[in-house]
Structure formats: C-alpha cells, structure tokens
Design a protein with these regions (language model features):
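A short, basic/flexible loop-to-alpha-helix module at the beginning of a structural domain
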Residues: 79-84, 128-137
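Pre-Walker A (Motif I) flank of P-loop NTPase domains
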Residues: 88-89, 140-144
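Long, charge-dense
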Residues: 118-131, 139
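N-terminal extension/subdomain marker
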Residues: 1-11, 16-17
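Positively charged, proline/Ser/Thr-rich regional signature most characteristic
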Residues: 13-86
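Glycine-rich phosphate-binding P-loop
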Residues: 142-159
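Catalytic cysteine-centered active loop of the rhodanese-like fold, especially the PTP/DSP P-loop
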Residues: 66-119
Length: 159
C-alpha cells in the first residue's frame, strides 16, 4: 500500500472513519481539526525531552530516542485504541507539519494493511487554509455576538 499525502481542502471528510491527531496532548488541547481524536505518539514530557536533546546535544541521539518512544506509544495505541478497527477502516493522520510523527504512525498502519492518508503540511497547513478561506469570504458572513446573563433566553432566541 501507499501512504497518500492529501491537501486538507481536497479531503472528503464523509469518506473518513477517523481523523487522528498524533501531536502531544497539550498541542491537541490548544487546538485541533474539528472531530479529530488525539492518539499522541509522544507525551508532553517526552516531546520536551527530545526537543532538548535535539537542540542541546545531538539530532541523531534525539531521533534515536524519539523513534524508541514513538514505537512504544504507537504499539500502545494499536493495543488499546485501534485493534478493533476492521480492514476497511479509513483514517486520516496529521501532526504539526505533516512530518515525522504523522508518517511514523501512518507507516505502521499502512504496513498492517489499512488505507491511510496524511494531511500534507499537517495542522499548520489546515490552519492556514482556514485563515485564507475566512479572509477571502468574510463579507459573505454576517456575525452576531450574543451576550447576556444565564437564564435570559439566549438559547431560545438562537433556536
């Protein structure tokens, strides 16, 4: 099989079973693609540790440790989160820039036999596309800011 690189704007979300964000929990918490689930390949602590080694010591040593931790974490996700997925499961995977973390996860899923795709450019690309769309189309939308205390029938007004 082959891992597909897909530009987010070209994706038919209705055909996907899951959108998987493999970034760390804190990155996911800040923001993520709507509907995505977080299956991090590195914890926040692991990501920080590898980043420190990468910058202060050796890129090679950081990559070796990263590969070890990522392999362990992907193995855990296979056992705990996705082992029940059938052969026809269609996941879309992304990380920050569509690089090493998403491809590590995608490569293993691909080797198992799932038809997997990676967001080209990762979450950063998705965010840029959303921003460009809004900047080009803002005049087509009418925004209303609705405020008020609890119990003042805001929900009734919206409905």
């Amino acid at each position: 099989m082959t891992i597909k690189r897909i530009i987010f704007s070209d994706i038919d979300l209705k055909k996907l079973d899951d959108i998987i964000d493999v970034r760390s929990p804190s990155e996911y918490e800040v923001d993520h693609i709507p509907g995505a689930i977080n299956l991090p390949v590195l914890s926040d602590k692991e990501r920080e540790m590898i980043g420190t080694i990468y910058k202060q010591n050796s890129k090679f040593e950081a990559k070796k440790l990263g590969a070890s931790l990522i392999s362990k974490n992907i193995s855990n996700h296979l056992k705990e989160n996705i082992r029940e997925k059938n052969r026809d499961w269609l996941p879309l995977i992304y990380c920050w820039r569509g690089g090493q973390r998403s491809y590590a996860f995608a490569t293993i899923l691909d080797q198992i036999g799932w038809n997997v795709a990676v967001v080209d450019g990762g979450y950063k690309s998705f965010r840029k596309q959303v921003s460009e769309f809004l900047n080009k189309n803002i005049e087509n939308y009418f925004l209303i800011l609705l405020t008020g205390n609890t119990g003042t029938a805001k929900t009734k007004l919206i409905n």
